[in-house]
A protein has these predicted regions:
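A short glycine-rich, Lys/Arg-flanked "PGG" loop and its adjoining helix->strand segment in the class I
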Residues: 137-149
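Non-membrane alpha-helical structural segments and their capping/turn regions in soluble enzymes
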Residues: 85, 133-140
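A short acidic, Gly/Pro-enriched loop at the edge of an enzyme's catalytic core
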Residues: 112-121
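A short SAM/SAH-binding and catalytic strip from SAM-dependent methyltransferases
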Residues: 120-134
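Class I (Rossmann-like) S-adenosyl-L-methionine-dependent methyltransferase catalytic domain
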Residues: 1-112, 154-248
Length: 248
């Protein structure tokens, strides 16, 4: 069976056909390539004395690469990885002439170490797409291994506690079971962890553990947390956002 995050290839194919250049344009933040909250947090992180000021950066789940291109304006050379071959092709097309590279790769696989060592690793909303505990453990362990000693890991992810009343109002048709969101999909049975609810099939879409549980996952992989920001749910967004910077 397929991993739920492998469905991103179909989404990027649809984006390409519609002329949509980045995930934010397609999803939550209309018309913005890198949203203001992300820029604010990354700007604060990059200003810290414990943050590398130059070197090699890798973005995990880079999509079409807007965040990586933004970071690489700050004296970094970059590599973006993603499981979607269409996303990687789009990223390469949008990054011609810049000091960034892209390749198809899966951060949850053991062979990810072949991509090299880095001073900075950034997860721009990839983690919450990884559902199974086994894959999340691999995500954190592999991220640690990709960094040089003293390298910095930045995670930005959705988390709980969620406002379930707002979820019902805002996320029409979706389900929230425990710490996993599910979306209706006719081919859900092709994917790990699908659910059948009232005669309809749903596939896992997002894993949103309690923010304290995510901090525990980060520490268990060997990271030292240096900075974190946590936003509350709102009437427009039932899930919370966690941003963390941690040293390897």
């Amino acid at each position: 069976m397929k991993k739920p995050y492998e469905r991103h290839e179909l989404i990027y194919k649809s984006m390409k056909n519609k002329g949509v250049r980045s995930w934010n344009e397609n999803q939550r933040i209309k018309g913005k390539v890198v949203d203001a909250e992300t820029k604010r947090f990354l700007t604060e992180v990059l200003a810290q004395p414990w943050c590398p000021k130059s070197g090699k950066v890798i973005e995990l789940g880079c999509g079409t690469g807007p965040m990586l291109r933004w970071i690489c304006k700050k004296d970094f050379s970059g590599l973006g990885i993603d499981v979607s071959k269409t996303a990687i092709a789009m990223a390469k097309e949008q990054s011609k002439g810049l000091n960034v590279r892209f390749r198809r790769a899966d951060i949850c696989r053991g062979d990810i170490k072949r991509v090299g060592k880095f001073d900075l690793a950034v997860d721009g909303h990839c983690l919450h797409c990884i559902i199974r505990p086994k894959d999340r453990k691999a995500f954190f362990e592999n991220s640690f291994k990709l960094l040089r000693k003293g390298g910095l890991f930045v995670v930005m992810t959705m988390c709980s506690p969620a406002d379930r009343k707002v979820f019902l109002n805002v996320c029409e048709g979706q389900k929230l079971r425990g710490y996993t969101t599910y979306s209706p999909y006719d081919k859900a049975r092709e994917y790990e962890g699908f659910l059948a609810i009232n005669g309809r099939d749903y596939m896992p879409a997002r894993k949103v553990p309690h923010w304290k549980s995510i901090l525990a996952e980060i520490r268990k992989a060997g990271f030292e947390i240096k900075l974190l920001q946590y936003s509350k749910a709102s009437e427009q967004d039932p899930l919370r956002d966690l941003a963390v910077a941690a040293l390897a």
